[in-house]
């Protein structure tokens, strides 16, 4: 017993010393260390995928090895942004679950998560509901079900799902999803506090893959940026870089932060680091704007064309960021409206309805746009872009007083919104 206790004390002492050394490193050294570790971890992940892929070739009708392979593909897809790996994860998980449904909820969850990552919301929801129904005590399926209800805009169902998760709302599988639910209802203070708590908890999970820990920093940064807290967003991004300095999701958000700061060369720097890994349509649209603002019309047009190519190559529904770019840059307005209407028939979430309202407005359907944006505002969400679009629609509808109120609220919620600053001549 004493020997076991001594070993435990020694382990804790060594772990504490290692953490102390790590935190005393400069930011540059921490990121260099993290980059080396991520390269090593990705190489190990590649080897594990090769190992299980070889086993599956020998035993294609099993479930366990194929299920493990699907989880590894999903992990690599998340880390690298590879759509091919997400598709491989879906195929392997579907095969594993098809081979054996009993005691194989892990494969079903990988299937649901890979479908969600490819924006196949309805099928992901169906799979998740079937898993959640098998065991109501499992947190992850219930939390994913609630998240998908938010994605689909089924807010009554989401309310019931999150109510059932109230006791677990601080746990990592639930916390960021619960925070998003709070934000949609206008409870921003509680949402922010919950995101910070989840980030702090995740940062201590050293066995958690780096891309997952980085994701919690990303959520804090994204919330801060959308609410005009630029220094807070930059700080969260810095913490994310300490974990995953080459994470394309962090770089994409960095480009958005640079745009909010009018740092258009910075947008292109961060954007180039993003698209070197993943042709993200939202980032390409932002880069097109950055190039245009700096007088590079040819470069702007090239980024815009690349964005359209990237959208065409991606699976799933129409990319919302690309749709917004086209609406604001005189693209094919009737086609964008048609695609946006099709998306809204599946997803009735606030951001999809906001985009539909903006497409209706750009196509001259002002009355319909007002009805649609009113549905969004009725949720209580505080979002400067939504309020800016609502103010434009209200003005076109002849309600100048309401337009002014909405514009004022947008400035209060996020004065750094690019559209607001352009209007002010900044």
Description of each model-found segment:
Residues 45, 79, 86, 121, ...:
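TPR-repeat structural position
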Residues 2-106, 126, 405-426:
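N-terminal leader/linker segments that initiate helical-solenoid repeat arrays
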Residues 63, 100-108, 134-142, 169-177, ...:
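Generic helix N-cap/helix-start motif at coil->alpha-helix transitions
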Residues 46, 50-53, 87, 94, ...:
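Alpha-solenoid helical repeat scaffolds
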Residues 76, 80-83, 118, 152, ...:
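Structural motif corresponding to the intra-repeat A-B loop/turn of tetratricopeptide repeats
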Residues 91-98, 133, 166-167, 199-203, ...:
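Amphipathic alpha-helical segments of tetratricopeptide repeats
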